[in-house]
Amino acid sequence: MERQKKKDMDFLTEDLWEIILARLPLKSIITTPKLVCKVWKSIIESRCFRDLFQSLHQNSHHSSWSLMCRGCETEIMSHYGSDNWNLNHSLGYYISSFLTDKFENYNEARVVSYTDVGLILVHRVSSQSFYVANPVSRQCVEILPSQKLDCFWILGIATRVENGVVLGYKVVLLKPNFTFLIYSSETGLWSLNSDTFPFSYISQEFNNPISLNGSLYWLAHGSEYQDFIVSIDFYVVDSRSDRCRATPFPDLDKVPKFRRTCTTSQGCLMYMNIFSIPKVDGNLEDKLCVWRLESWQWRLVFEISLDSIKTGFDYIPLGTDPFDAKTVYLWSRKCLLSINLHNGDIVLHKDVEHSSAGRILNSVDCPRDMTYILESNFASFVLPQWMHPFPSTVRSV
């Protein structure tokens, strides 16, 4: 019987295998072929197969994503199910499972950087090694430490992406003398690189960098309460370009309700905050303002009144939907809430919600302590629409 099945499989042409495999969830496509045969592996790594898969799944929901609390792998909220990956659990579950299975001592390894292309950067304290991994597919490579690793800040991982495929990545560390120690997947080597910062500063925050489009972004503080977003493009090809930039926040003439932080949406850097604006009658009105960074200038894209939220000032902005810039999320003492910035609709969410299409929104693990949330840093972790085996010049583990 088994021999007959194998003969039947041998009669299937490569075109037929493409059609069969393209109807599977992305998680199955990535994890199964490497266990079966080289032919399947060759099929799924082709551009034609990727185009076929995306055309068959074009009506699926956006990829799964989660808002993670940095430093502790706590999942603030998650969206998953009924997409290309067809996951049964949230991304936080897969991260926790991956770390538990990968490391004997769970506490010795921590996630230090999240991306919007399905990769996380893990630091193993005992050996000073780094691991670049996709916790869902379990693809993982180990990056051995450089001999120059004495004292450094971990900035994160910058990625080079083309047509949705990760072609390369760089692990970026910053030494106290503001020299970068960079590991490149294309060379398999660590190298030192220095840059000139285009502004004077009092302090910089290296605990919450954002990885986006080959660049890393983080917050810096100048004199007279001037806050900046610092960005460095680690894949700039024009040597004449200023790869290091400092962009002042757009609301320096106002007093924001919350400390300044950024999120990402649809491939852009986003900033939102809440301000008390005087009304005509002299009373104050809370307004949520959202800006998008375009050509190194902040553009106000949404401004909406929050007077309709009748809970007092009892909510904290969390971030923007990675796939929908007009949807933002806030946390109150009772629950997660979302606001549609286009029409002003406000939705109070349950801890777990199931849509009719099978999509799941989960915020059950979010800490209920408002002070904890207020003082935490958050990062979006997003799975891509397609996951090609990511490049590596070091051994897979």
Swiss-Prot record:
InterPro entries: At3g26010-like_b-prop, F-box-like_dom_sf, F-box_dom, SCF_F-box_component. Residues 6-56 form the F-box domain. Pfam families: b-prop_At3g26010-like, F-box. PANTHER family: BNACNNG10540D PROTEIN (PTHR31672). This is F-box protein At3g28330. The lineage of its organism: Eukaryota, Viridiplantae, Streptophyta, Embryophyta, Tracheophyta.
